[in-house]
From Swiss-Prot:
The keyword Cytoplasm does not apply. CTPSs have evolved a hybrid strategy for distinguishing between UTP and CTP. The overlapping regions of the product feedback inhibitory and substrate sites recognize a common feature in both compounds, the triphosphate moiety. To differentiate isosteric substrate and product pyrimidine rings, an additional pocket far from the expected kinase/ligase catalytic site, specifically recognizes the cytosine and ribose portions of the product inhibitor. ATP binds at S15, L16, G17, K18, G19, I20, D72. This is CTP synthase. It comes from Salinibacter ruber (strain DSM 13855 / M31). UTP binds at S14, K189, T190, K191, P192, T193, Q194, K225. The keyword Chloroplast does not apply. Signal peptide: none annotated. Residues 1-268 are annotated as: Amidoligase domain. One of its GO terms (molecular function) is ATP binding. InterPro entries: Class_I_gatase-like, CTP_synthase, CTP_synthase_N, GATASE, GATase1_CTP_Synthase, P-loop_NTPase.
Length: 565
């Protein structure tokens, strides 16, 4: 059976939710029995987002095979409950690098290398790569940015060519656009959408469906108008309203008939040629999850101490992991964002004294590091549940070395090259590397869990695999003194003996990890470390009277059908 391709473009403005739409559509098709994957093309010149400032880009999401990617891949994995790879995120910089490398190798036989055909052909190669594996029935391809952006034009040309080569029954274009409501006029305006589609048509692309992002329900008249002036059928004009939770969007799209629109086009004779594709999606698990999500029994406060908390997309996978970890136990986590720069001995009590747990987030650079160290100290001394991720683990070890081992000035060589007690040091294989991009310890590595440890109790396994993104590690030369003072290193890499997990056995829940468990949380399978941490925080919240009644989120959209909720 030939792989089908859905191309998702955007118009009028960025940040419309193409990633959430793609993930939600993928879930609707997956729940019909189809094998689906989603990829994203980013038009920027960076080879990957690994060296970009989180204020510019948000979180860098890491795949099993070590790709540093856009945060939308986190949405794809969480919604579809399956991993992505290097082939799921491609940038213009990567495309050009591949083409230039081929030219240097003589692959083009002396021809003049141009955008057409060479850059376009490289884009088409990556668009088809996942489908050619034979593992997927449907590949959804999201194009970053908006129609009309100069940097996006090669991608539109690649789609035009593929649509011609693969045929209309094997391709589909979904165009997301904004339908603004003008309060003064008291009506929804379609003109921006008309101009956006006109721009798409100028590139030789006729959208098959128009997805209308709006704060208000679009009327039948608005649908007819968009249908008439944008050359699509009325049933192909889909509204995608603002929702209380991104996890409601699959049901909102289901109610709009989005799944039927796709399968009727791709599989018109489902009973004969494709028994794998069912007529209706089985969303029972999703609906059960959403019921628990929207009806929690209690709310607990957890502090997220980080450097970039003003831009919450920088910690997107962590905040989503909190949400998903609480759902099975019907607990709503209220995240208190604490800028690590604001923490001092004078402010730490006011900032952390009213939370049920402290998570110290990953990061780079020395700004705010002392605040993170102070947060770890406060949690240890007050026996507040503590979870340190990547740099969070390193800060907890620095704090322990200073105040338990008595090593005054102990630090990481990332921040103090001359420290007398370099408890955190650059990994040996990193010392000869000068390039920044794509050179960290990236991707999935093994972690052997010590029997009898809290980590073993949580994982219920002797060996696990987790994703990494770091250059610095616990210094094994000083590690054994930390052990003597009561710290336990309950997880290590079996090949390199690098520390992966640290815990303090005498505390109620004090654990740090060098890897990033937030990258392995999905709707169907919240990460066990986050689940255990949230449970420990819930127990502490009950002891300290920090539990509150759940606060309903501000209602921004029509409620879901009562048959679901």
């Amino acid at each position: 059976m030939q792989t089908k391709y859905i191309f998702v473009t955007g118009g009028v403005t960025s940040s419309l939710g193409k990633g959430i739409f793609s993930a939600s559509l993928g879930r609707l098709l997956s729940d019909r029995g189809l094998d689906v994957t989603i990829q994203k093309f980013d038009p920027y010149i960076n080879v990957d987002p690994g060296t970009m400032n989180p204020y510019e880009h948000g979180e860098v999401y890491v795949t099993n095979d070590g790709a540093e990617t856009d945060l939308d891949l986190g949405h794809y994995e969480r919604f579809l409950d399956q991993p992505t790879s290097q082939a799921n995120n491609v940038t213009t910089g990567r495309v050009y690098m591949e083409v230039i490398s081929k030219e240097r190798e003589g692959a083009y036989l002396g021809k003049t290398v141009q955008v057409v055909p060479h850059i376009i052909d490289e884009i088409k190669h990556w668009m088809l790569k996942l489908g050619e594996t034979g593992d997927y029935d449907v590949v959804i391809t999201e194009i970053g940015g908006t129609v009309g952006d100069i940097e996006g034009q090669p991608y539109l040309e690649a789609i035009r060519q593929l649509r011609n080569e693969l045929g209309p029954r094997n391709t589909m274009i979904a165009h997301l656009t904004l339908i603004p409501h003008l309060r003064a006029a008291g009506e929804l305006k379609t003109k921006p959408t008309q101009h956006s589609v006109k721009e798409l048509l100028a590139h030789g692309l006729q959208p098959d469906t128009i997805v209308c992002r709006s704060e208000r329900s679009i009327t039948a008249e608005v649908r007819r108008k968009i249908s008439l002036f944008c050359n699509v059928e009325e049933e192909a004009v889909i509204q995608m309203l603002d929702a209380e939770s991104i996890y409601e969007v699959p049901l909102l799209l289901r109610d709009e008939g989005t799944g039927e629109l796709v399968v009727d086009r791709f599989y018109p004779k489902r009973g004969d040629e494709n028994e794998k594709c069912s007529d209706t999606p089985d969303l029972s698990d999703w609906i059960g999850f959403l019921k628990r999500l929207k009806n929690p029994e209690e709310t607990i406060p957890i502090a997220l101490v980080g450097k970039y908390v003003e831009h919450q997309d920088a910690y997107k996978s962590i905040t989503e992991s909190f949400i998903l970890a609480g759902v099975p136990d019907e607990v709503q986590v209220e995240v208190k964002y604490v800028p690590s720069e604001d923490l001092s001995p004078d402010t730490v009590e006011s900032q952390l004294g009213d939370v049920a747990g402290v998570l110290v987030a990953p990061g780079f650079g020395d700004r705010g590091v002392e605040g993170k160290i102070l947060a770890a100290q406060y949690a240890r001394e007050h026996d507040v549940p503590f979870f340190g991720i990547c740099l969070g683990l390193q800060c907890a070890i620095v704090e322990f070395a200073r105040h338990v081992c008595g090593w005054d000035g102990a630090h990481s060589t990332e921040f103090d090259e001359d420290t007398a007690y370099p408890v955190i040091d650059l990994m040996e294989e990193q010392k000869e590397i000068s390039d920044k991009g794509g050179t960290m310890r990236l991707g999935q590595y093994d972690c052997r869990i010590q029997d009898g440890s809290r980590a073993h109790e949580i994982y219920e396994a002797d060996m696990v695999q987790e994703r990494h993104r770091h250059r610095y590690e616990v210094n094994n030369v000083l590690r054994y003194k930390l052990l003597e003072e009561g710290m336990r290193f309950s997880g290590v890499n079996p090949d390199t003996d690098l520390v992966e997990i640290m815990e303090l056995p005498d505390k109620r829940w004090f654990l740090g990890v060098q890897f990033h468990p937030e990258y392995r949380t999905t709707v169907g399978d919240p990460h066990p470390l986050f689940r255990s941490f949230v449970r420990a925080c819930t127990a502490y919240a009950h002891e300290e009277d920090l539990v509150t009644s759940p606060q309903p989120p501000e209602r921004k959209a029509v409620p879901l059908a009562s048959v679901d909720m």
